[in-house]
A protein has these predicted regions:
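Residues lining hydrophobic/aromatic ligand-binding pockets adjacent to catalytic sites
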Residues: 1-140
Length: 140
């Protein structure tokens, strides 16, 4: 399963044996984990959005500059590569698509809480539109 979450829940994500993968342009200095910058916002429009806080502007630019330039199959393969070779072999030997395998657990993480505007929600929507189940990991 592919989840979305945020850095404040990193410890709990790891305790659930879910592989965290940052999808932000710049991670916290203390974060030493996996990063996938191909799903991060472009610095220029991100800084412009920080000034104007226009979510429609952000959505338009993120879609056009990031998501429209990504292939879902390549993104899934890149995420799959965060698993160890042994894990990959185990997952591949099942007879279902690997992103549906119960052992394929990744959390795409960034900074914002679930209720806040965040590009990870746009990434999740894009994946869902491409037939990949994604949900926000709710941890109390």
């Amino acid at each position: 399963m592919i989840y979305t979450s945020y850095f404040a829940k990193l410890k709990q994500i790891e305790e659930l044996n879910i592989i965290p993968v940052s999808i932000c342009g710049r991670c916290p200095d203390w974060y030493k984990g996996n990063q996938y910058k191909k799903l991060a916002p472009n610095y220029k429009f991100f800084m412009e959005w920080k000034q104007n806080q226009d979510n429609d502007f952000y959505i338009e630019h993120f879609q056009k500059e990031i998501l429209d330039n990504r292939n879902i199959d390549i993104v899934l393969q890149d995420l799959f590569n965060f698993f160890s070779i042994d894990q990959q072999e185990f997952i591949k030997n099942s007879h279902i698509p690997y992103w549906m395998n119960n052992d394929f657990n990744i959390a795409l993480i960034c900074y914002e809480k679930p209720s806040d505007f965040c590009h990870r929600h746009l990434v999740a929507d894009w994946m869902i539109k491409n037939g990949i189940p994604v949900k926000e990991l709710i941890i109390k």
